[in-house]
Structures are given as C-alpha cells and as structure tokens.
A protein has these predicted regions:
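Soluble, non-transmembrane domains of envelope/secretory-pathway proteins that act on or interact
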Residues: 30-150
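A conserved catalytic-loop motif detector
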Residues: 1-41, 45
C-alpha cells in the first residue's frame, strides 16, 4: 500500500531540503555539515509560537518554543531563530555517526537547470516528466548521494 505517488514524496523532500540549505533554516545544513536535512520553520501571529519540524531519512524531530499561556515571544523570535537552534543541537547528537542518506529519484521525475540571478538557490528545479518545459532540456535529477568535489 502506497500513501502517495513516489514522485510527490521526492518533490516534497527536495523542496523541504531547500529550506535547510537556502531558506529560513539554512543554518541547519551549514552547522551540521549535512545536505540530507529537510524541514519547515513556523511562526504564529504576534510571535506567540515558534517552531521547526525537520527530518533526515532515519529520524524526525520538532522543536516548539512558546508559553503555556500564550504571549508574545518578542519581535525577533521566529522558527528559524528561536526553535531551530534546539533542533540543531538535538540532531547533532542523534546523527553523530549516521551517514548522509537521500531518497533515490523515482521514475518520471526530471530536472532542469535553474537560472538564478543571485547565484543563491537550487541549481535545478524538478518536474514530473510530463510537465517539464521541453525547451529547457530536462534530464535526470542530480544524485545527491554523490558528494561534490571540494
């Protein structure tokens, strides 16, 4: 029994990994020196709650910062500033000797080069094969289990 199309799982994993590499949780990958982390930051209205939920292929963890009786945490307290450091500290311990692990790309997913004017952000964008813009010459996604040359 499969809950969702493997292509959806792969695309979501890719988007959530981008959060920990280029987005509001980029400190996770840079601090832990891993590319296989994924997650989502969150901050409620009026900065009452801050959270980060993230995972690696072998472990999932969430960090929530707030008060039992809701009140403002402070204007600078967000998921990326208040909750993420706790998550990073926990994951540093549980992933200490765990090698990086990535979902393999399923059949039917292709990548196209991602033009970026800033040089920041993902080098490729993923598509269902049948929805890829043909003029951008789709090809198989990058195998993230292969470490780039230093």
């Amino acid at each position: 029994l499969r809950a969702i199309d493997p292509r959806n799982a792969y695309l979501m994993d890719s988007m959530l990994r981008d959060v920990t590499i280029y987005g509001t949780a980029a400190r996770a990958s840079s601090t832990l020196k891993r590319r296989d982390l994924a997650g989502k930051t969150g901050t409620t209205n009026e900065h009452v709650d801050a959270w980060f939920c993230g995972y690696q292929q072998t472990v999932v963890a969430c960090s929530w910062i707030g008060f039992d009786q809701p009140r403002n945490l402070g204007s600078g307290e967000t998921g990326g500033t208040a909750a993420l450091p706790t998550w990073i500290s926990y994951m540093a311990k549980v992933l200490k000797d765990v090698p990086e692990s990535f979902l393999p790309a399923p059949e039917g997913v292709v990548a196209v080069a991602s033009p970026s004017s800033s040089g920041k952000g993902p080098a490729e964008e993923l598509f269902y094969q049948e929805n890829a813009p043909a003029e951008l010459e789709p090809e198989p996604p990058v195998d993230h289990s292969i470490k780039p040359e230093d």
